[in-house]
Structures are given as structure tokens and as C-alpha cells.
């Protein structure tokens, strides 16, 4: 009986490890959750490492690493909370899952765009335009800086 109980306890511990979430923030609009690369659909954040280059912004003639800033803003928001994602489309051209992800029921995409640390990706979605307009009107995040849109940065890099 004790042996059976020991096996059962070990089995339960193994199950918990098997279902534990592993999360790594890749950049301001991409995470790796349980080994799956997930790209936040409908938004675009500054690049922290695109072909070996990091996107920068200017504020009062000071260079700001806005790619890293966006990533850090996302890391801080997630903290130790559980991230859940709702798949929206087929994987993109880079084989990333496209999804909207949430922490405590709050959209991380909306949080990033409304805070000025990502942009509504109008080419693919109209969902976050109002949030971008709010950030722009209030000069939040990158809207307080001189910046290049991420899609333009990628074209010139």
C-alpha cells in the first residue's frame, strides 16, 4: 500500500512538472510559451534584435533602446502571472503562432499599444487603433520620442 501511495505521489509531482508553464519574452510582441513561439496578432513592437540590429528612439537627443524598452515593459506586466493565449490565425510566415495573449484577463496587446510600447498593426488588424490613438494623444511610451515604425525599421535594416 505504501509503495502504491509513493508511486501515486511521484506520478502527481511529475504531472505538475509536465503542465508547468515555461515563458520567455522574446521581444515586445513575441513570447515563447511552453516551447511554442507566439506572435501577438494585430500589433507590432520595436525590434530588440532584428538581423543583429536593435531599434532605437530619441528623446531629448538621448538614444533610447526602444526595442529593449518595449520588451521590459511586457516582462514587468507579466511578472509571475500566468499567460493565456487565444489563437487567432494560422502560423505566420516564420511559423510563429498568431494569438492574443492575456494576463489576469487583460490583453497584453492592448496594454502594450495603449501604453505606447507597441503599435496597431493596421496592415493586418484594426482592433487596436483606438488604443494607439489614446497613447499618441497622451504622448505615452514611444509617442513621447522620435521613432521609426517597426515595419519601416525592418525595411531599412
Can you say where each PLM-predicted feature lies in the sequence?
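Small beta-barrel nucleic-acid-binding modules, primarily SNase/OB-fold domains
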Residues: 4-157
Amino acid at each position: 500500500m505504501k509503495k502504491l501511495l509513493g508511486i501515486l505521489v511521484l506520478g502527481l509531482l511529475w504531472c505538475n512538472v509536465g503542465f508547468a508553464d515555461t515563458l520567455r519574452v522574446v521581444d515586445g510582441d513575441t513570447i515563447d510559451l511552453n516551447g511554442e513561439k507566439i506572435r501577438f496578432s494585430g500589433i507590432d513592437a520595436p525590434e530588440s534584435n532584428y538581423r543583429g540590429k536593435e531599434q532605437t528612439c530619441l528623446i531629448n537627443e538621448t538614444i533610447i533602446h526602444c526595442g529593449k524598452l518595449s520588451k521590459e515593459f511586457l516582462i514587468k506586466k507579466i511578472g509571475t502571472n500566468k499567460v493565456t493565449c487565444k489563437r487567432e490565425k494560422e502560423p505566420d510566415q516564420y511559423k510563429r503562432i498568431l494569438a492574443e495573449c492575456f494576463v489576469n484577463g487583460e490583453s497584453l496587446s492592448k496594454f502594450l499599444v495603449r501604453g505606447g510600447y507597441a503599435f496597431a498593426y493596421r496592415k493586418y488588424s484594426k482592433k487596436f487603433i483606438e488604443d494607439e490613438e489614446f497613447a499618441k494623444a497622451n504622448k505615452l511610451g514611444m509617442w513621447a520620442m522620435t521613432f521609426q515604425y517597426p515595419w519601416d525599421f525592418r525595411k531599412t535594416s
